[in-house]
Amino acid sequence: MKIFREVFELGNKEIILETGGMARQADGSVTVSCGNNVVLVTTVVKKSVADGTDFFPLSVHYLEKTYAAGKIPGGFLRREGRPSEEQILISRLIDRSIRPSFPDGFFNEIQIVATVLSYDGAFSPDILALIGASASLAISGAPYDDVVAGVRVGYTNGKYILNPNKQDLRDSDLDLVVSGTYDAILMVESEANSLPESVMLGGILYAHKHLKTIINSINRLAKVASKPRIEYSIYQINKFLKSQIKSQFFGEIKNTYTIASKQERNLKLNAIRKNVLEYIFSSDVDGNEYTEKEILEAFHDIEKDLVRSNILEGKPRIDGRCTETIRPINVKIGVLPGVHGSALFTRGETQALVVTTLGSDRDAQLVESLDGIEKCRYMLHYNFPPYSVGECGMVGMAPKRREIGHANLAKRATQAVFPNEEAYPYVVRVVSEILESNGSSSMATVCGSSLSMMDAGVPIAEPVAGIAMGLIKDGAKYAVLSDILGDEDHLGDMDFKVAGTRYGVTALQMDIKIKGISREILEQALEQARVGRLHILGIMNEVIKEHKEAVSDVAPQIHVMNINPAKIKDVVGRGGATVKGIVEKTGAQIDTSDSGEVKVFAKDKKSMDMAVAMIEEIVAEVEEGQVYKGKIVKLLDSGVFVNLLGSQDGYLPFSEIEQAGMKTNSLVEGQGLEVLVQNIDRGGRVKLSLVAR
């Protein structure tokens, strides 16, 4: 067993790449270690293309084992189940980073599995998994020539932090992950606290500078440990077939791509495709027999060339816009009468109905991870039904990876403006229903979420808007597109989503299909996105620019009380009897804390006011000189104890009773008396006198 190792430093932390010791039957197997974190990443490459495959079947699976953190899983089976949303997001991050580095037309299946074997809690293992995925690919024999690496960058007190730990990130205004090759940037994912575009760009370039150390180490490992390159073929469009289709149908295709309506355009294109198939099948084009798949791929290539060349030549885009124009926007709030907050955001042929629901602490999501169980007060869910693109499909299933990814992006975009628990005690769930989609539904979700929360009275710090930028690049010539359509995303080279407030960026997500982009393109895309974002915010602000002061009449009420911690036991009562009585009488939810915090959550104001009044009565402090209506709770030889407030009793001597003209032998437990608090001694003992009738 021969083991190869590479060691390098990243942000003053030593990282070790090792191969040859584990999972040796995989085509590529690398363990990545940093401190007590260990991630095993394997790559398996199929040596042939499966019949009928017309895409690159790359799959990435990031898995966390609870034993890595010295824990036993919960649940009846006591074993790991389906991956969590966080694990799915990390799988997507790795996939998006490495996918652009494979040659076009490579259709061999590749499966990458990253398994967290040991975890120390200080650093997230996601970057180690990304580095390991690249290293295992580099030694697997796959056609992976442009080695990729990734790093995380933070930003605190005006300085960038390389490879920040979890504590660093808590204090950071930026959580940025960048991956790329030695020469270019491939993927960006970030969450930020309304930072200027210049800071975001600086962070991306800072990250890229430090990628080179990792890439050099991976290359050194591959030089000594790589398997021979597999034999593979590249699928290519038949040029003669393409020319034949173009000669007969190009005029029709060109005219069709001037139709702004997506549905009308697709109907016309489908008709042309049908005619193309009939033409090729009925004529002896060059003595060859072509499959329907080959014909349609050649047709698609003509579409791609046409759309791209039009844009690069400065001609109008598919829907007639120039590169910087935003589609028409329509904004409505309060569109659903029975919900707590709602908004309908429409941009061109993309429409999101976003609904906000307010809840109590008990509605918070409990998220289990290697770090333990975390309470999530802000949830954002994204649904993409098939009718949104005019198709039939499965409905009501578990969310797909794409839906999870889009929800996470929208949440990251709005997280920076979401109020903390002290300022806003509600738990909030936002749901985005995509009703129509023709590009950038995730950014419509960002805009709709901001509007919907403001409609619900959630005190977000600033409205947030998002925009998707695209890129068409051919050699040195390129065009950056604002607010891309679905076809421009599909046929273009970049999908760059930028969200933020009027002050700066709150989230970035960039994916590209080419071998990387330059600083110049990034700079232009960020500036163009800033202008577009401010335009969108301006339209949103015409409808609502700050949160409503009051929640909806149908929304639940919440009230937070801070009482003397010693009084919590009085509110709860023996065995919880007191608090249960309040709940049964008012219908409110009551949560208490040893710190003295009491949260009252009720379905309406009447219920809440009643519960608050009952609690205030229990915790009220007896004051000297005040008159109270109490009840006798105990008879003694020399006097009686009278309950005044809650569990507070006072002593009333018989002498005081007789002085007021009342006979002591007529007193019984439960009898009401009006008494005056004469004094309260240092021990808290209360002396009473009877108020004369």
UniProtKB/Swiss-Prot annotation:
UniProt: Mg(2+) binding residues: D489, D495
Keyword Translocase among UniProt keywords: no
Cofactor: Mg(2+)
Keywords: Cytoplasm, Magnesium, Metal-binding, Nucleotidyltransferase, RNA-binding, Transferase
Domain S1 motif: from-to ranges: 625-693
Compartments it resides in: Cytoplasm
SUPFAM superfamilies according to UniProt: Eukaryotic type KH-domain (KH-domain type I) (SSF54791), Nucleic acid-binding proteins (SSF50249), Polynucleotide phosphorylase/guanosine pentaphosphate synthase (PNPase/GPSI), domain 3 (SSF46915), Ribonuclease PH domain 2-like (SSF55666), Ribosomal protein S5 domain 2-like (SSF54211)
InterPro entries, per the entry: ExoRNase_PH_dom1, ExoRNase_PH_dom2, ExoRNase_PH_dom2_sf, KH_dom, KH_dom_type_1, KH_dom_type_1_sf, NA-bd_OB-fold, PNPase
Disulfide bonds: none
Domain KH residue range list: 556-615
Pfam short name (any one): PNPase
General function of this protein: Involved in mRNA degradation. Catalyzes the phosphorolysis of single-stranded polyribonucleotides processively in the 3'- to 5'-direction.
Complex and partners: Component of the RNA degradosome, which is a multiprotein complex involved in RNA processing and mRNA degradation.
Family: Belongs to the polyribonucleotide nucleotidyltransferase family.
Annotated PANTHER family: POLYRIBONUCLEOTIDE NUCLEOTIDYLTRANSFERASE, POLYRIBONUCLEOTIDE NUCLEOTIDYLTRANSFERASE 1, MITOCHONDRIAL
NCBIfam families according to UniProt: polynuc_phos, PRK11824.1
Name recorded for this polypeptide: Polyribonucleotide nucleotidyltransferase
Gene: pnp
